[in-house]
Amino acid sequence: MKITVEHLPQSTVRLDIAADPEEFDAALERAFRRISQQVQVPGFRPGRAPRALVERRVGRELIVAEAQRELMDRLYREALQQHRLTPVAEPEVEIYQDEPLAFRVEVQVYPQVDLDGYRDIRVEPREVEVTEEEIDQVIEGLRRSRAVWKTPDEPRQPRDGDQVIVDIEAYEGEQPFQEPLRQATFVLGESNLFAEIDQAIRSLRPGESAEFDISFAEEDERVSPELRGKTLHYRVTVHEVKEAELPEVNDEFAQSLGVATLSELRDRVRRDLLREKAQAARAEVLEQAVQRLLEVATVELPPALIERQVAADVERLREQLRQRGSSLEEYLRFQGKTLEEFKEELRPQAEARLRRYLVLEAFAEAEGIAVSEEELVAEIERLALASGSPEQFRAFYSVPSVRSYLADELHERKVSERLLELVTEGRGAVIGEAARVLAGAEPAEGTEPAAEEAVTAPEVVDGETTPASESAESLAVTETGSRADDDQAS
């Protein structure tokens, strides 16, 4: 067999494959034997008739075509294996010589990645710190999360920080527009209410209502699509106004969080914030390293691989919508897009994810990174012992698909660790005290889980809150950003 390989754009290769005369003669003989078993020639048992009689009965062309079919399949697979090519689409085949067989194949293949110069990438580690003001902010958030909501002694208009219970209705002409919000709870200054609604609420005492119009720009992406380009008539009714009674920040407050003293609480908050900042800094350094790696990498994505990724993304969304009781068709109608338009929107993201994956896999191969069976078993055992139900955990990870998922996670972790080690010259993504915290400092003894809230943005808790449906809430609240803030600023 003779093979000529030509690399074309978009990770496509052209293979010119020519069979040796001896190979083709052997393939003809095998084809003749297969066909002769199926042909009835008077005076001969199946498979016993002379070749000339069989050719006369079925035509030499059939035997040649059968030999070509078998030989093309085998030689094509051998050519791919010999040149380490992995097809990602069906090949286009052209036979340009019948005997001995010679044919041309064009096929999109798994792309090769060039990482020339990647070992010279450098990224500076981060040093992070926590200020007293940041600790104060978290303590204040914890304080507000334990607020007791009380009705003011005298009825009054609401102000920043007050909790309001309201009805919000919207009309398009005379007809109600979507489901109204009933007995919905908001905290003024902490909810992304439309500026007009926020201002109206602030002007009303309990039991009072206001009516007004809001016009939404066609291009305003901060509101839900069904509102864009419309002018709606709103009616807002305030039912209750409540003010927050906040606990004093002292040792008793700390004890309500499972910490002995206020000083210990501040130490715990500081350490948790430091860990959070260190994790964020590590993620930033890692992402910067990945972006630098992508910059030095050269890779051409085959269109078939991109289409496969887009199709997978569409099916993933379809399944997610199905689990929520919806459908892709309903989603597209809501977005006002066709399936092809939606796929076109997905394509740049799909290309970026594919390129990132391929480059990181090429880095792993260049660095000899792999997950051994011993490493996988050790990780399963570590997780099992930490789970509290080791036997059940081990049984769960004996399932091949689950085991494979964990192996992928370990692989990604090893790739990240090696990349960070390389770009920081072994110093790590963060340095100083944050590095020690990130390495896994244990929580202080006697600290209850409640104190973990210190590193999260707490929400104001009130047992009387009546949540609104997502579709109804879109009548009053921005989807992204803060339309209210922008409008008030202007």
From Swiss-Prot:
Involved in protein export. Acts as a chaperone by maintaining the newly synthesized protein in an open conformation. Functions as a peptidyl-prolyl cis-trans isomerase. HAMAP family: Trigger_factor_Tig. This is Trigger factor. GO terms for cellular component: cytoplasm. Residues 466-481 have a biased composition (Polar residues). It catalyses: [protein]-peptidylproline (omega=180) = [protein]-peptidylproline (omega=0). It is found in: Cytoplasm. One of its GO terms (biological process) is protein unfolding. Residues 161-247 form the PPIase FKBP-type domain.
